[in-house]
Structures are given as C-alpha cells and as structure tokens.
C-alpha cells in the first residue's frame, strides 16, 4: 500500500509540474519590446547584456542587484545591465536611480510584455546574452560568480 501511495504521489506531482522560465541556453532571446527607460537613459552597446527581472520591494532582488553590480563594473565595458521592472516610476524609479551609470539602465515593463516573452515566473531572474541575443546564462544573479562570468565573456 505504501508503494502504491508513493507511485501515485509521484505520478500526480509530475502532472502538476510548474514550469519556470522558458529561456533555453544557446537559443535566441525573444524580443522584449523595452521602450521606456528610467530618465530616458538607454544602455550603452556592449558585446554582452545582462537582463535582471526585478521588483523593488523584494529583498532577494535587492541582494541579487547588489551581487551583480561589482561584476558589471569589473567586466570592463563588455557587459551591460538592464534592470527590468513592472513597477511604476513612483514605486521603483527613485530607488533605482542611484544604480544608473554608463552600463546599468532601468527599463519599465508596465504591461509585463518582457516578463511574458520569457515566461518569468519568479524573481529575481537574470539572463545574460551576447550581441546576437543568444542566451549564454540564466538564473538568480546572486548565484553568478566571477569565474562563471569570466567563462561566459571569454567563450566564443
């Protein structure tokens, strides 16, 4: 009876599997239609771009941003960061203004198109892609290390 219950539980859990993001390493990132940037400050063109899906009230998002900022600065203009939020300027703009620089920008996704285009179901979520928009890495930016980033930036 116990074996039957375990098999039944496994079968039911496989039917209700929740899907995370639909981003696949090596495939092209869908167009996210980012149009509205904080202070109209669009990111500099860089060989690699990191997209960080963000919410200003989330402590995990704040930690993720804090962890990735030094990596962006150490990338020597090879990697730009676009912070994407579904929040209004009044909610997120003020707190995110301090993070703006030549290689860090904030995009407002008020209708959630960017979140939907890559099926973001949890935040913080981060995607690194090359200039052809080919996905090279995805996950929580807080787990990205300098060694992993170096491999991403040096692999052709």
Language-model features: locations:
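Bacterial N-terminal signal peptides
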Residues: 5-14
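Short active-site neighborhood of thiol/selenol oxidoreductases, capturing the structured segment around
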Residues: 41-64
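Thiol-/selenol-based redox modules, centered on thioredoxin-like
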Residues: 129-156
